[in-house]
Amino acid sequence: MSLPIEQQIKALKASIFQITCHQTGGKRAKRDLALSIFIKFNLGVMLNQLVARYRHYGATDLELTEHVFIDDTYICLDSKLFSSINLAALARSAQIYKGVVEALPVFSDVLHSLIEDIWLDDQKGNGLGQYLTPPDLANLIGNLIDVSESNRDKRTKPYVIHDDCSGAGSLTLPAAQREARVGRHRTQLLNLMVNDIDPLMCCAAALQFVSSMVVHEHDLHQLRVICSNALTETKPNSKSMVVIKTPEKVLLNVKLAHDQHMHEKLQLFKHMNSLTNRILNKS
């Protein structure tokens, strides 16, 4: 039996802190470093799993080259640093994180409370975490925008949602989640562009979206994560960190696989229903 989400988040936080338990330095610096390692490592893991998933659904090497761009300089971990951390804690934190993503609805803001707790802890309001949009407020803003868009349900073509100061994706995740409630065909219309000046926040936003795409198999039309100053660095000077455009072949094969799965479940239900009727008729 799995633990309640609150306890899983607590266990995840404790596991993250253990990543740098062997490091020297102050408590604050060790925790900040642990969070950075956790986010970058898990983003790398999830991106590898996304590419493997695309291959599973028929994407060729050429299609992957054309549809997936990753700037490794943002997520690479120094080998010297990697050799000095608690690898067991890192692996455990990755396992717990994936379990939390699986347990929550698709495109949930898993990292908000985690980052807020770590960055604001003992900071007396001086940490960057204070600027992350609270999930309740993000959902309210999204709902207000939703009401104003009368043609939302009639959309049949990809459309863009852009956030220039995205943080960990707090404002764009609810939009993706609302479309996901309708169905996979709706998230496949989302062209998300998220930007932040902080490279770690860009990694966090990318991790949140990619992990849901992998774990819940809800593909986006495109995800573009940009690391730049939105006021001074505009195209073509803005820097794309991650660009993922789901290949059409993958979208088609995912639909076929899920349709087949639903058909098999329906057949099993009919079979069980038939057996039940026979037993009842005999009695």
Predicted feature locations:
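A short N-terminal interaction module
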Residues: 1-119
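Histidine (H) residue identity feature
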Residues: 22, 56, 67, 112, ...
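Conserved aromatic-histidine-acidic binding/catalytic patches
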Residues: 26-34, 99-106, 126-133, 163, ...
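Generic low-complexity, intrinsically disordered sequence content enriched
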Residues: 91-94, 141-144, 279
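Class I SAM-dependent transferase core
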Residues: 109-136, 143
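Conserved S-adenosyl-L-methionine
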Residues: 134-235
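S-adenosylmethionine
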Residues: 202, 208-283
